[in-house]
């Protein structure tokens, strides 16, 4: 299968925990050592914890938690599950770590996660964000997680200004967060998610294209991709970003407003993420992206 999207074991060392649309990945590093990748949404705390406990008998053996970026749907579990993992170290970029020390940034993460709670749902006890056991990682740094797990940190800005990805050279596996955008499950292509800077977004995709041919590509939403979907992922995402730029500039040349195309993208793309991305927020994010592209895309003439 080109796409693995069911919770459970994905590879001999890899499991998907929780909801496939906002998953947490579990890496078996050795007989008594584990790592998590991606930080999910707060609503799924007990779901992810239950899945974790099916695979890990002793939570003190979870030693690392790798986070790609600061957005609410990639770190929402941290204050709820870190207190249950006494030996865990959270690894994220310096900018991500700083965001968790910002009262305003934390308020946004908590507010957006509260909007996703089920009826009558209450969140478990949490620690303070600034009490998380974090360590900042840098671009190019090698993370020696275990004897068979050596992952490289690669800066991948553009979607956000703090984004990093994690590359396992041994397995040619890339945990890419939202750096490539959102994988369109109906069409098999990438939908751009440029929420910070278009030039940085494209530069990141160019950099990822220079990696050895990937065997596994693991975005922050939707599961694991294999075959050509993995090998050509960064190239496809680059092409689709330029395609959207051309589409936007053409529509503007015809006198259409950003609002019209924002609404169109929201109607076409919003359904896939509706369970964790409220409609109003999705529409606003489409508008934000088009504003960025409008400012930075090369003109048609």
From Swiss-Prot:
Lineage: superkingdom: Bacteria
Enzyme class: hydrolase
Residues that, per the record, bind Fe cation 2: 73-74, 178, 221
GO-annotated biological processes: secondary metabolite biosynthetic process
Keywords recorded for this protein, A-Z: Hydrolase, Iron, Metal-binding
Phenotype upon gene inactivation: Mutant is defective in pyocyanine and rhamnolipid production and fails to kill worms efficiently, but can still produce PQS. Deletion mutant produces increased levels of DHQ, resulting from intramolecular cyclization of 2-ABA-CoA.
Membrane-crossing segments per the record: none
Residues annotated as binding Fe cation 1: 69, 71, 159, 178
Alphabetized InterPro entries for the sequence: Metallo-B-lactamas, NDM-1-like, RibonucZ/Hydroxyglut_hydro
Family matches, as SMART domains: Lactamase_B
Catalyses which reaction(s): (2-aminobenzoyl)acetyl-CoA + H2O = (2-aminobenzoyl)acetate + CoA + H(+)
Note: As mutant can produce wild-type levels of PQS, it was originally thought that PqsE is not involved in HHQ/PQS biosynthesis. It was shown later that the role of PqsE can be taken over to some extent by the broad-specificity thioesterase TesB, explaining why the pqsE deletion mutant still synthesizes HHQ and PQS.
Protein name, UniProt field: 2-aminobenzoylacetyl-CoA thioesterase
């Amino acid at each position: 299968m080109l796409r693995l999207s069911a919770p459970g074991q994905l590879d001999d060392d890899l499991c998907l925990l929780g909801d496939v649309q906002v998953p947490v990945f579990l890496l078996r590093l050795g007989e008594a050592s584990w790592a998590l990748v991606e930080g999910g949404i707060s609503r799924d705390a007990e779901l992810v914890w239950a899945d974790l406990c099916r695979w890990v008998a002793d939570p003190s053996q979870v030693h690392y938690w790798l986070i790609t970026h600061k957005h609410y749907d990639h770190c929402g579990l941290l204050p709820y599950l870190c207190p249950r993992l006494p030996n865990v170290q959270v690894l994220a970029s310096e900018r991500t770590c700083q965001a968790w020390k910002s009262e305003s940034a934390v308020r946004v993460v908590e507010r957006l996660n509260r909007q996703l709670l089920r009826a009558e749902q209450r969140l478990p006890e949490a620690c303070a964000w600034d009490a998380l056991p974090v360590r900042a990682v840098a671009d190019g740094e090698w993370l020696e997680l275990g004897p068979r797990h050596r992952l490289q940190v690669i800066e991948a800005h553009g979607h956000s200004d703090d984004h990093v990805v994690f590359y396992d050279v041994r397995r040619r596996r890339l945990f890419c967060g939202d750096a490539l955008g959102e994988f369109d499950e109906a069409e098999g292509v990438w939908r751009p998610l440029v929420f910070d800077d278009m030039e940085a977004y494209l530069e990141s995709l160019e950099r990822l294209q220079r990696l050895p041919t990937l065997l596994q590509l693991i975005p922050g939403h939707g599961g694991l991709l294999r075959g050509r979907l993995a090998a050509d992922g960064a190239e496809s995402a680059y092409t689709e970003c330029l395609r959207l730029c051309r589409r936007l500039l053409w529509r503007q040349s015809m006198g259409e407003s950003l609002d019209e195309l924002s609404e169109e993208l929201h109607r076409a793309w919003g359904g896939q993420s509706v369970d964790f991305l409220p409609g109003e927020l999705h529409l606003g994010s489409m508008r934000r992206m088009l504003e960025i592209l409008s400012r930075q895309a090369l003109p048609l003439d």
